Amino acid sequence: MPATVIREDGAYHSFCGLTCVGWLYQKIKDSFFLVLGTHTCAHLLQNVLGVMIFARPRFGVALIEEADLSKQQPELDRIIDEIVADHHPSVIFLLSSCTPEVMKVEFDGLARAVSRPNLPVLFVPASGLDYTFSQAEDSVLQALLPFCPVAPPDDRRVVFLGSVNDAIADDFRTEAARLGIPVAGFLPESHFHDLPPIGPGTVVAPLQPYLAKVAGRLARERGATVVSSLFPFGPDGTRAFWEDVAAAMGIAVDLRERERQAWERLEPHLDVLRGKKVFFTADNLMELPLARFLRHAGCTILECSSPYINRKFHARELEALDGVRVVEQPNFDRQLRDIQELRPDLVISNLATTNPLVGHGVVAKWSTEFSFMPIHGWSGAATLAGMFTRPLKRHAQLDPLMDDPLWVAGLMPAR
């Protein structure tokens, strides 16, 4: 029976969708990501992604100035010429942001106007007004979909849906070959012209829990079969994922022993996690599979909150969380009161609230980091577990230090 989802009145948006640039420009190596935005957008990308501008990364911001308010459309031709001269991309993604959305910039027409015969400029809606942190990847993949070749009905192969780094992608290809599963490729691939063919015979295996819209389009527009399974996070999710993908291809596999061995290798992490109380506030749409993994690892999940829950796309994860309090669009004021009352051992929270929580004595972890780390599949299980155990170990080491009178020597008592 799936977990009951409680819907509250909190903010749907948690962090700007423009930050999807951080992992996608590294994944699609012949791309350029151009944000039409303000100085605030530029500062966000500069500071959050930690890439100095003189490193010439394959992303940039076309700044909206006051003079642009009176123009019919922003002028981007000169900027596109500079991008082509400096980076020679095969595709440019034009990302919207809050200010031009409010100005009612017609992005579809703008993207078509600045496209070149051999260089498509694709509009990607990524504004924080409409999309939460990780959902902007969904928009990028929807923009790529028309460029995927149409596979014939008898082309029965798997397409993995979602961006993962090259090492994880190689692991998935190797595992598929070991199980006898034919693979057409990944969406997205590392290069624009290598996009996989997708058609009625294609089996789509989602790797990320925030790609519900593009998965739906693949089923509707290409007739592909979208696998409903756990997402491949942790040994439990990875086993279910591969068994379900194999079943969709008509192949019977039993990975119980493989899962048992994977849990054995995680035993040092499990010793730290067992019995811990964990609280998820809402941020990156990865909360459901992360909470499911921790529950299997022996943690008590006090609450698992997410900005958006798709009952169909997340059905298997909700089944695995039966009995857990699951909240959509949570009210953060209520969450703060619950955190103070329930005193969790670990809180998974967004960038805006993690440091204030730490300042109030709460052991907290940035949820943003999970989007950038190689945590998928068998090979990513140790990295995933370590992301939860590190803050717990650090806190355990600091606690005895804070009892040392050296820290308060010579301090006047508070009045």
Swiss-Prot record:
Pfam families for the chain: Oxidored_nitro
Enzyme Commission identifier(s): 1.3.7.7
Domain of life: Bacteria
Pathway linked to the protein: Porphyrin-containing compound metabolism; bacteriochlorophyll biosynthesis (light-independent)
Molecular function terms from GO: 4 iron, 4 sulfur cluster binding; ATP binding; metal ion binding; oxidoreductase activity, acting on iron-sulfur proteins as donors; oxidoreductase activity, acting on the CH-CH group of donors, iron-sulfur protein as acceptor
Enzyme category, top tier: oxidoreductase
Keyword entries, A-Z: 4Fe-4S, ATP-binding, Bacteriochlorophyll biosynthesis, Chlorophyll biosynthesis, Iron, Iron-sulfur, Metal-binding, Nucleotide-binding, Oxidoreductase, Photosynthesis
Amino acids binding [4Fe-4S] cluster: 16, 41, 98
Keyword field contains Oxidoreductase: yes
Protein's GO biological process: light-independent bacteriochlorophyll biosynthetic process; photosynthesis, dark reaction
Catalysed conversion reaction: chlorophyllide a + oxidized 2[4Fe-4S]-[ferredoxin] + 2 ADP + 2 phosphate = protochlorophyllide a + reduced 2[4Fe-4S]-[ferredoxin] + 2 ATP + 2 H2O
Cofactor, free-text remark: Binds 1 [4Fe-4S] cluster per heterodimer. The cluster is bound at the heterodimer interface by residues from both subunits.
Cofactors that this protein relies on: [4Fe-4S] cluster
Job description of the protein: Component of the dark-operative protochlorophyllide reductase (DPOR) that uses Mg-ATP and reduced ferredoxin to reduce ring D of protochlorophyllide (Pchlide) to form chlorophyllide a (Chlide). This reaction is light-independent. The NB-protein (BchN-BchB) is the catalytic component of the complex.
Family: Belongs to the BchN/ChlN family.
Quaternary assembly: Protochlorophyllide reductase is composed of three subunits; BchL, BchN and BchB. Forms a heterotetramer of two BchB and two BchN subunits.
NCBIfam families (UniProt xref): DPOR_bchN, PRK02842.1
Protein name: Light-independent protochlorophyllide reductase subunit N
Organismal lineage: Bacteria, Bacillati, Chloroflexota, Chloroflexia, Chloroflexales
